[in-house]
Amino acid sequence: MTEFIPFIILIGVAFVILSIILSFVPVGLWITAQFSGVKVGIFTLVGMRFRRVQPIRIINPLIKATKAGIDINIDKLEAHYLAGGDVNTLVDALIAAQRAEINLPFERAAAIDLAGRQVLEAVQVSVNPKVIETPKIAAVAKDGIEVMARARVTVRANIERLVGGAGEETIIARVGEGIVTTVGSATTHKHVLENPDMISKTVLSKGLDAGTAYEILSIDIADIDIGRNIGAQLQTDQADADKRIAQAKAEERRAMAVAKEQEMKAAVQEMRAKVVEAEAEVPKALATALREGKMGVMDYYNMKNIMADTDMRDSISKVAPNEKKYEEE
């Protein structure tokens, strides 16, 4: 029994070595490639292992391309994989382009994929146009009525401009700008409601797909509604603003009038003070005139009589209105 121990150990070591070799050498994948008509060396697959490339990610797409009649270099696929591209999607896009008779070289497809675009979706949109629906866009006609429109834009991907071309957001923004311009130039909102195709024709004629990754095939107005009366609202707001301005100016004038009244009252009080001051000087002047002989005694008494007569007249004038008031009561 002991004589079989070295043989068993040898078999175990051989099995371990074979397992290690098979983990680095994808023999099953190599056999599949050979039977699929893909000429790839076993050492090429081993090299992929050392370059941290999963051979199945390269060989399976290569088999699909070969079966579809597309000649692709395995080194290009590996380089695209190492650059972060999706090899499987790339090959699917090349096959779809070939079936649709679209000229799509490998280099352009790889550039589109590495640029972050969905290359397969781009090919599909080139064959089957895509419909982009815009949100409701509000615009105001010349008569002040708000018109809200929603459009459907049918686009086809432009393979030549996918790299560096603007996307759907730019298309939506340009269509919205065209709708606002067209509605804003309309004389009345009724004209827009009667001819909604006027919007699509005007917008389509502006060449909105310039510099984008899409080619606009048609623009259709899907829905159109009437919104607020912006003109009337603006006039109301302006009237309110004018009213507030007029009220502010009136309040300013009232304040100035009150201030002027207070100034006049102060001036009257000042004049009265001066009169009182002047009246206080009269007795002094009379005494001086009598003392210096400039005024006689009879003149003085005549003046006193005149003053008494004046006071009596003032008293009568003050009593008469009160008596009349009592008679009326």
From Swiss-Prot:
The chain crosses the membrane at residues 4-24, 27-47. It is a multi-pass membrane protein. The keyword Chaperone does not apply. It is found in: Cell membrane; Membrane raft. One of its GO terms (cellular component) is membrane raft. It holds the Pfam family FloA. Its main location: membrane. InterPro entries: FloA. Keywords: Cell membrane, Membrane, Transmembrane, Transmembrane helix. It comes from the Bacteria. HAMAP family: FloA. Belongs to the flotillin-like FloA family. NCBIfam families: PRK13665.1 (NF010186). Found in functional membrane microdomains (FMM) that may be equivalent to eukaryotic membrane rafts. FMMs are highly dynamic and increase in number as cells age. Flotillins are thought to be important factors in membrane fluidity. Homooligomerizes. This is Flotillin-like protein FloA. It comes from Alkaliphilus metalliredigens (strain QYMF). The gene is floA.
